[in-house]
Every structure is written in structure tokens, then in C-alpha cells.
Curated annotation (Swiss-Prot):
Residues 333-398, 486-547 are annotated as: Disordered. Residues 177-343 are annotated as: SNW. Belongs to the SNW family. The keyword Cytoplasm does not apply. Residues 358-398, 526-539 have a biased composition (Basic and acidic residues). Keywords: DNA-binding, Nucleus, Phosphoprotein. One of its GO terms (biological process) is eye-antennal disc development. It holds the Pfam family SKIP_SNW. This is Puff-specific protein Bx42.
Amino acid sequence: MSLSSLLPTPTNAIWDREDERRLVARGAPKIGALVSAKIAAPPYGQRKDWVPHTDADFGDGGAFPEIHVAQYPLGLGAPGNVGKKSDALAVRLDDKGKVKYDAIARQGHGKDKIVYSSISQLLPAEVLAEDADELQRPDEETVMETTEETRLALEKLTNQKITSALPVRHAQKAGPAQYIRYTPSQQGDTFNSGAKQRVIRMVEAQLDPMEPPKFRINKKIPRGPPSPPAPVLHSPSRKVTVKEQKEWKIPPCISNWKNAKGYTIPLDKRLAADGRGLQQVHINEKFAKMAEALYIADRKAREAVEARSQLEKKLAQKEKEKKEDMLRMMAQRAREERAGLRNPEAAEPSGSGATGSEVRERNDLRAERQRERQRDRNLQRAAPEKRSKLQKERERDISEQIALGLPAKSAGNGETLFDQRLFNTTKGMDSGYGDDEAYNVYDKPWRDSNTLGAHIYRPSKQADSDNYGGDLDAIVNTKRFVPDKQFSGASKEAAAGQRSGPVEFEKEEDPFGLDQFLNMAKKAPKRAEEKNNERSSHSDRKRSKRD
């Protein structure tokens, strides 16, 4: 015996919301029907025990107010749809029952935003209101009034321009007098002479035509705002193709000088941003003319510089030759003075025997030779470094007959002499190559012992052997530097002949003019004394004449 058997049968159906949700979550089994069934709500008055569960139970309408159960037609207000947002727009109808599609254009804009959704909204009000009074043609009277007002306004503007340009303006005509009734606020016998009202005559003040303007009238007035731009009607949006995207792609602005963030920019992007490939390169023909003119100017300038340098070299060479001549003369004089030579005019006639002066000269010459031999021995005993330095500083004898790198000249006819070793030899390329094992580069001496240089400083047989002693080998083995040209002023006959000794120079008495300067300085006080004596004698003469 159960409890349900004891209880009476329930009159209402049992419905539990939680059980219903579980069934919906599980999903009711789908049973295919052979005949389509149309689900509809029961008719009105028979819905006592019926509860809508699906969207199909509501049909196209809303909730059922007579059923006291929470209802969510089309899912509106359902607990699961509270936080969700939908882009669906509610369908609205206009006064004629047509769907208002302007809601699509207004979507996403504020309520105060003006959105033109039809062509009629873009037309001005004059076009829409064709029957308005403002658009009607005016009558003849209105046309005449407007014409007269326009004429007067234009005349006024023209007269103002003319009068402002004139240096002297005419006096303006005074306007008519105006009469104004004035009622004072303070009434009484003590005010306004007991009068309650007054009549005031208002007259325009007279203006001075010669008075300059008081205010600045040429101030520039800013322009008013322009008319609003015309609206642009856009075509419906369509998907942009890849080609259009590439055409609309604008390269970024890349600076050639600044890169604050240190980005690594490829060269093709730099060239695209530079835009050099978009413009056609055109080289002006005057660039070639300018380059040619610059080349000609540069060539002429180089020629001028070369000519100047050649001239300077010639002048420097002449100056050098002049100084060398002067040095040769000074050396000649010094050698003559050192050797004690005298001019034949100043020499006294010598007797048959040797005088004391000649003996003294020979002794001096022997002493000088002895000093030179002592110096050579000291050089040979000196250290190698010091010896090379002293040998460089040795006094060099100069000969005008020996020139380095130049052929010698014969004494008779002046023909050029060549090295005889070069003649009658078959040592060219056609004679074949030498033996590889032989080393005959220095098999022969470069200079022959029978040349002029070997005998030019050789003492003659008539010279005194005591003067030279054992200096012959030293003189032969000594290398001398020779000039490449003759001395200026030397005769060819003397140059061609053989010389028995080195070149001797005459010493100049006063090369820098110091003796002459000292003599002038010494004579200056004497001249001053002579002038003073002359002045004193002249003054004495004048005094004697006066006396």
C-alpha cells in the first residue's frame, strides 16, 4: 500500500521548471513524421493548462498575457541572452506603411548626427517648395523699388570713393532738424523751470572739410567663412582587389639624414621613397659646354703655370750660375792669397840667385803640403763614421774638362770622344747569350787608365819632388766631382790645354762690402767736423765784413 493510492487524484498537471530545463538540455528524440504538423497555440479561452515552450508556440506574435508564466518570445529577455549584443535592427514603417531603410544608414551614428539617406534631402528648400511666395516672380512695382534702392546704394559708394580721393572735400550738407519731445523724470516746480515737458530741436553738427580722418579706415577685414562644401555621394562599398591595394599603397617617408629609432631600411625601399624612378632624367646640353669650358680653362691655367715655372727655373738657374761664378772668383782669390802669388806687374825683377822672399814662399808651400799630409793620415786613423763624414766635407777640386756622364772633348778640333771599348765589339742580341756559369759583369774596369782624368792632376817632371813627396798615389786614387759646364769667362784654349795643378781661385778683397762701409763710417765724423769748420769760418768771414 503506497502513499499515492491513498491520496486523491490531482486536478492540475504537475510542471517543474528544472525538469523542463533538463529535458531541453538533453534534447528530445527526433521522430520523423510522415505528415507535416503545424504547431499553433490553442484558441483563446482554451489555454488554461497550456504553457508555451518553444518559439514556434508564439507564432509571429508576442507573449500570452493570460498565461501567468515567464515567457520569452524569440528569446527576448531570456536569462541566457542578457549579456549578448545583437546587430539586428528592428523593422520600422513610415506613415505610408513602407519599410524605413534609413535605419541602416543611421546605424553606428549618434542621435544628433544628420544622415542624408535619400536624394530629396540633398535638394535645397527652394526646389522642394515650388509654390512658396519667395520663389514667385515679383511684380513691376517691386522691381522698380529694388532698382531705385540699388542705384542709390551704388551712387553712395561711388561718391564716397570719389570724395576720399579728393585732396579737399566739400562740406557735407546738414540734415534736416529733428524735434523731440522730452519729458523729464523729475517733476516739480523746482525742476526744469516748472515745465513738465520740453521740445528739443536736434541739428547735425557742422563738420570741417579740411579735418583729417580721426580713425583708421584702411584696416583689412578678414574674409567670411566660405560656402560649405558640396556633399559627395559615395557608391556602395565593394571589396578592394589586390591590384587596387598595390596601386593605393604609398611608401613611407624615409629620411636620408635622420634615423632616430635606428631601423634597418633596405635600399629598394629607400629608392621607392625617394621617387627617383618616377621622374625622367633629362641632362641639359649646357653641362657638356660647361665641362668643355672648364677643361679648356684648366688646360690654359696649367700651361700658364708651366710657363711661369719654366721662367722661374731659368731665372733661378741664372742666379745660381751667377753665384757660382762669384764663388769661383772668391775661391781663386783665396787660393792666390794662400799660395802667396803676386801679380807680374807688382813683382820686382829677381837677380840670378834666389832671394829671401822666394825661399820664404817655398817654405810656406812646403808647410802647407805637410799639413795636408798630416790631415790625410789623421783621416785614415779616424773612426769609420767620422771618416765618412770628414770625407764628405773635404775640399773638392773642380775641373772644367771632366764632366760626369758627358763625353770628353779633344784638345785640337773639339770633336766629341766616345769610349773606344764600345767600338768593334759583337755583344748584341744577335751574338747569342753568355754562359750561365760565367760572372763577367765586372771583368773589365769602367774607366781606362789612359784617360785624361788619370793624368790631369799628375805633377810634371819639372816640378820639385820635395813639394809633393808621396802624394802621387793619393792624388791618382782620389775621386773628384767635376762640373757639367765650363767656367764663365774661361778661354777655350786654356780649357783644352793640360794643367799641371788644380784650379786656383782669386780671393775677393771685400765680397760683402764691409770694408767700404767701415771706411764710410769712419769718414762721416771727419765730414761733420769739416762742415762745422766751414760754418765757423763762414760766420767769421761775415763778421769781418760787418766790421
